[in-house]
């Protein structure tokens, strides 16, 4: 029996862990970077080809929004890294959003969704987006009725879920199933190929960048494990988004978010910052903290950070090299790195090696036809 390849992989994982441990500023161990495991699937929403196909149609279907203009794909376009390419996500007509549209690439691996971790699963994420006032703004009863007047959907829901009529809870389950297919292909990710034994998958610059990532730059302190995210929350002291001050519609959205998330009266009146994790915990120590985003597919998912303040990986690396931003609650992990220009380029080269060599694209599905009168009263 040939045990050479497992031994090589074990040595690689060990070397990544040692590289960080030797240079870390604390004694905590961090999971090394590694290829993604199989996509986790909840027992109450198993995958099937038919459910995935239905979910893809629903992800693209304009009928799942208030005025029929904001399907899921409008903010998560495959050609734009499964985001929308803007600093701040486009809002529902008549509104403006207040955060960067996160990519849904590899979102199946997160234990919580949204920048402040406000929901626990893709099944919960879908309605939050489709029904959110500044996102899809769809009324679930109206969207459900629309689906019931489309014969193709009636048949598809009956086939997949065994229900007489389409139901929105099932629609969200189908969308979640589809999103679990929007994941990196390890055979096209240079780092994954390297980790799986192809020592030529990374070039010299990328290998130097990997050493920096796990060592001097300390990226692995937060961007670790297969997802390249510890899924924890930090205040980086990021620059503010000027629109919150300059644009009345952003102020409307910001104050509404404060109100519906239940912040204190003084914080509501100020409306001068995005409080992040605080909205979930109401712990003052969590003000300004946001979840560590995955670095997988970062090559294609600019702009970066919860407010889209950085347009390139160069800007991101420069920010961390300075020790992050300012603020009394800024993470103590952030310290000036004093990276040389070549080190920055090597680090960026390695971060890009966590992305596929070409972007993940899905063709638009064929959507069911127009509404048709029902042959019998709905029961």
From Swiss-Prot:
Heme c 1 binds at residues 72, 75-76. Transmembrane segments: none annotated. Induction: Abundantly expressed under iodate-respiring conditions. This is Cytochrome-c peroxidase IdrP1. Binds 2 heme c groups. Residues 50-158, 204-355 form the Cytochrome c domain. Gene3D superfamilies: Cytochrome c-like domain (1.10.760.10). It holds the Pfam family CCP_MauG. GO terms for cellular component: periplasmic space. Its EC number is 1.11.1.5. Its cofactor is heme c.
